[in-house]
């Protein structure tokens, strides 16, 4: 697993494990020095930019207090002393009860089918050889990748799986602001958001929330390019040392993402089709005609516009770093590149 050394001081190291990170921003929210930065969450989740969810400033203000590591639900941040990670009852990831499978398991594979992180597998699955009508095998959960969403337990027909969520909370999406860009759907680590399939002329929600799967991490909020989503953490569920103090800090408004990417355009490759202008959720929020997919008036937009047959960036600062433009471009003429954090 890839490791990023964020800072080293004497025999202590601040280490980031990007493959475990879900882009929730809890670490950024709780950092007392503002040393951690989150940005381009949607683009990172979609695999459309070469960067990680989290970066660290180089101001030297970090005091290695370990608060960021303590609230990380997946163990993506570590404070190490002499190379050994600090893990005790004051760390949320260590306090979380592991997702486990007991002897009631019939190895049916439903949990494998629904796991959003593909961290469950069944080994040596075969019909029992004792004459009974049952399956034998081993159902294995990779705890390093499990996000404790509970999908597996919810679909298990025998109640063989136990789990514990990291947070309790509330989810709110403003339908008047949401542009149905699907950035939140692609980002959610728990598959708790989806788009319903509607029939002709049927009114359906732009995005539907699966409450029972949500872990209230806040990754969707960090990813939304138009700030249509608010996730609040009301409680830390596992018993852990210093829980009340951490809950108080996490009850504050979540940290807003930093612009950690920059839009790039290949003018020679651009067809001037305007697909990116129409699909851009920031543009669509500004202009309801674009949200309806109208192909006219492709100039005078807040972020992207077509001028003289070529797309151009109007204002980098309003970009939500979702990379929807990059996804829809038929000529690969627009993309996001990493922007250095001061």
Set out the residue ranges of the language-model regions:
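DNA-contacting interfaces and partner/effector-binding or oligomerization modules
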Residues: 1-2, 30
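Ferredoxin-like iron-sulfur electron-transfer modules
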Residues: 3-23, 41-64, 83-107, 124-148, ...
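Iron-sulfur cluster-binding cysteine motifs and their immediate structural context
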Residues: 26-44, 67-85, 110-127, 151-166, ...
């Amino acid at each position: 697993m890839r490791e990023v050394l964020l800072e080293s001081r004497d025999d202590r190291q601040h280490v980031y494990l990007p493959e475990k990170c879900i882009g929730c921003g809890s670490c950024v929210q709780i950092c007392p020095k503002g040393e951690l930065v989150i940005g381009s969450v949607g683009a990172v989740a979609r695999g459309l930019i070469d960067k990680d969810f989290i970066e660290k400033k180089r101001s030297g203000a970090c005091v290695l207090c370990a608060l960021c590591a303590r609230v990380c639900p997946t163990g993506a941040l570590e404070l190490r002393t002499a190379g050994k990670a600090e893990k005790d009852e004051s760390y949320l990831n260590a306090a979380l009860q592991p997702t486990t499978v007991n002897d009631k398991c019939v190895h049916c594979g439903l949990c494998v089918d629904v796991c959003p992180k593909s961290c469950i597998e069944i080994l040596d699955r075969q019909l029992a050889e004792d004459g009974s009508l049952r399956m034998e095998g081993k159902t294995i959960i990779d705890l390093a990748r499990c996000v404790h969403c509970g999908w597996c337990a919810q679909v298990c027909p025998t109640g063989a799986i136990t789990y514990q969520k990291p947070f309790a909370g509330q989810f709110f999406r403003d339908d008047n602001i949401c542009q149905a860009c699907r950035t939140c759907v692609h980002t959610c680590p728990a598959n708790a958001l989806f788009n319903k399939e509607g029939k002709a002329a049927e009114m359906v929600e732009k995005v539907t929330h699966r409450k029972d799967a949500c872990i209230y991490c806040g990754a969707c909020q960090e990813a939304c390019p138009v700030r249509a989503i608010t996730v609040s953490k009301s409680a830390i569920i596992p018993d852990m040392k210093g829980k009340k103090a951490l809950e108080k800090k996490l009850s504050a408004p979540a940290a807003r993402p930093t612009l950690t990417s920059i839009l790039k355009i290949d003018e020679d490759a651009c067809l001037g089709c305007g697909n990116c202008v129409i699909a851009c959720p920031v543009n669509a929020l500004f202009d309801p005609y674009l949200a309806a997919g109208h192909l006219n008036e492709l100039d005078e937009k807040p972020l992207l516009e077509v001028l003289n047959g070529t797309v151009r960036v109007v204002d980098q600062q309003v970009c939500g770093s979702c990379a929807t433009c990059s996804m829809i471009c038929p000529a690969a003429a627009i993309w996001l590149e990493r922007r250095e954090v001061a």
